A protein has these predicted regions:
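NTP/phosphate- and nucleic-acid-binding module
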Residues: 1-191
Length: 191
């Protein structure tokens, strides 16, 4: 179980690293009102701790803040103003598979109930986009930018063919390139 959780945390590291976020992790354990027996909770919490240790990053315990159906790892990022936002989460759920009667056959041929992993790498997409816009001050990384580059020929007559050739090369390289063909007309309008 911990290996699957560790894989989720590796994905968090890759995604948040690409986005340029520093993040912290917390292991949230069994709340007062919860479902399931002590042994299942202890096993699940142990798997989360093992996966967190495997990352080599610091993490904290967050006693009693797990979901009613299982423990979880919360990943928080700081925005440009220093506020913390909970974004990614990896949650273990051993209640729903049991309630739905889900089963699998293990290597020994025994019927077992799986543990469900709820994984949200970005968390709420809207929240993540807002944090990312604030974090980058609106200057998105090139690979994520909706406008990666623009070709603006100063004179359409004299530079138009060359500008189109450059645009095609950038397009072939996988960049989204806007071609602004009416630049001179816009300058005249402004004047």
């Amino acid at each position: 179980m911990w290996r699957e959780v560790a894989g989720c945390l590796e994905l968090v590291e890759r995604v948040y690293g690409k986005l340029g976020f520093e993040y912290s992790m917390r292991c949230s354990t069994r709340p007062e009102k919860s479902l399931g027996d002590d042994a299942a909770w202890e096993k699940a919490e142990g798997a989360l701790r093992e996966a967190l240790d495997e990352t080599g990053r610091p993490w904290e315990m967050n006693p009693g803040d797990g979901a009613f159906y299982g423990p979880k790892i919360d990943v928080t990022v700081r925005d440009a103003l220093g506020r913390e936002h909970q974004c990614a989460t990896v949650q273990l759920d051993f209640q729903l598979p049991s309630r739905f009667g889900l089963k699998y056959t293990d290597a020994e041929g025994e019927s077992r109930t799986p543990v469900l992993i709820h994984r949200a790498i970005l968390g709420s997409l809207e929240r993540m986009l807002a944090i990312l816009i604030e974090h980058t001050k609106g200057r998105w990384p090139l690979w994520l930018s909706p406008r990666q580059c623009a070709i603006v020929p100063i004179s359409g007559d004299a530079h138009g063919d060359y500008a189109h050739a450059v645009r095609n090369q950038l397009d072939d390289a996988g960049l989204w390139c806007e071609f602004v063909s009416r630049f001179c007309e816009k300058i005249y309008e402004i004047e």
